Curated annotation (Swiss-Prot):
Start-end of Polar residues biased regions: 237-249
Molecular function as annotated in GO: ATP binding; ATP hydrolysis activity; hydrolase activity; magnesium ion binding; microtubule binding; microtubule severing ATPase activity
Chain sites annotated for binding ATP: A319, G359, T360, G361, K362, T363, M364
Principal localisation: nucleus
BP GO terms, sorted: ATP metabolic process; cell division; positive regulation of mitotic cell cycle
Originating organism: Caenorhabditis briggsae
Top-level division of the source organism's lineage: Eukaryota
InterPro entries recorded: AAA+_ATPase, AAA_lid_3, ATPase_AAA_core, ATPase_AAA_CS, FIGNL1_ATPase, MT-severing_AAA_ATPase, P-loop_NTPase, Spast_Vps4_C
Name this protein carries in UniProt: Fidgetin-like protein 1
Acidic residues bias (residue ranges): 76-93
Family assignment from sequence similarity: Belongs to the AAA ATPase family.
Cell compartment(s), UniProt: Nucleus
Function: Has a role in spindle assembly which acts in the progression through mitosis during embryogenesis. Required for fertility.
Catalytic activity: ATP + H2O = ADP + phosphate + H(+)
Amino acid sequence: MYSPKRVKLNLTNGMRKRPETEENRGELYPPTAMARNGISPYFIGKPRRKIVGDHKASEAGPPPPFPLKPKRKEPDDDPESIVIDEDDEEDEPAPQVEKREPKKTHNRPFFGEKSSLTATELETAKKEEVVKKKDPFTMRGFDFGSDEKVVKIRDKICDIVDPTGARRSDPAFIQQMHSNTLKGIEVATNPKFKQKRTANNKNRAAIGSTLGTIYPNFLTASGQEPQKSKFQIPLDRQSSSQSNHSQPIRKTLPEIPRRCSNSLVKKAMGMDTDGGGKDERMDGLRSEPTLKHFDENIISLIESEIMSVNNQIGWADVAGLEGAKKALKEIVVLPFQRPDIFTGLRAPPKGVLLFGPPGTGKTMIGRCVASQAQATFFNISASSLTSKWVGEGEKLVRALFSVARLKLPSVIFIDEIDSLLSARSESEHESSRRIKTEFLVQLDGVNTAPDERLLVLGATNRPQELDEAARRRFQKRLYIALPEPDSRTQIVENLLRGTRHEITDHNLEKIRRLTDGYSGADMRQLCTEAAMGPIREIGDQIATINKDDIRAVTVADFTEAARVVRPTVDDSQLDAYAAWDKKFGCLPPPL
């Protein structure tokens, strides 16, 4: 058994030399020893060991487990020797290796400058290389006919092409299916396939019609014939490809500049809103210098609160409340109609407060003001001016008044204003306090012009909970009390206009006595209940009876309805409203 020689390893072969000591001076680096012996799993090269003389295998050790091939003959080399690059140290004898013929494999042989193949094999490989250069796809004609997936796909295609199965036994049909499969695989594996597809229109048409050529009876899932392309040819290309006598189907649209505004694009495409209202308003508001520091979502939220009054409500529709209607005409309608007269001391107040028990018509008066004032009407609630983000509520209040001042004359109606401007205390949250402060500053502050036509109309059921600073800014505080007897009679007449009834003046007097203490909402509920009296008498005949056969509403229906509908306002609450009106109200008591 011979001991392999110790070699110096450099950094080019991926290993470092083990440092020499007295203990390991006679040892060899383990990977090197394994590589020299030919048993290393990482060794993929061929040993190049110099054979010296006729040493026997017993003296030099066993032969390596792989064959050694003679190197190409060079001028200075022995034709039967194999050389390994080592140091200048003395070589130890290596075993003689018997010459073995290389094993033939099915893989393609490697050939190059230092090939160990025979001349016949080299000639055969060169011929294959020449054939490959001429037609590089001859070696890719693999037969996948027996593959399981290909068989399944072929069966599905056969079911489509031959659903009855009559041609399954035809050898020509089977051969066609097999050849089509191989042809499709060969086309798909061709790297020039995409280049051929995009070469020209003729090639596209040829490739698009491949399916129809292979399967002439093929139909799509919808039962239609396959189309070559689902995209329409542009008009300029189509017109150029046709004759000069053919005219285009439609005119081409002019090219729109990139910097064109969205509103112009929408109008050109016929997608603008009715009159361009909201988009034009939003674009106009964006250009205002006073709104540039507001976010777009804040301006959009305020714009959404602008109320468009479709149903015209007149002062005659509001029963009673003559003092409140007269005061509102002087405050809202007349100054907006003649702003040149109402200047200086005649300038209308900035804030009007409507207070009273629930159901007395405060909200309806606000709708009437919006209809009669011909002004921009903002219908605001407490939720419109609050946000979960800190500082967002103050911005909403400031944006509300900024937009209202840009759209003068304006009316801001806030229902249930006590939830927004309640009395400030130490226990309330800081954000709520800031919103109230901002509202009061915007309503009557340093930047408020004395002659601007901006009115804040508030309605509340709890005036005693308002902050004292807010109470001062509402110069006109109008008490909307319960309807008087004559007002209740007028409410009944107004509600019965579209219903058949037999109510006379004598019956109205009786209804007036029955409804003492009723509010306007209670009177409406009473009339609704009385109108359902004739319907309840019909019973199951409601599906077949004629509309004209339903009897009219009588005073008996009101009497029966009065037993169900009761007044909702307590007398103690009325006393509290009367006391607050006596202390802070601005309407003189009725004569």
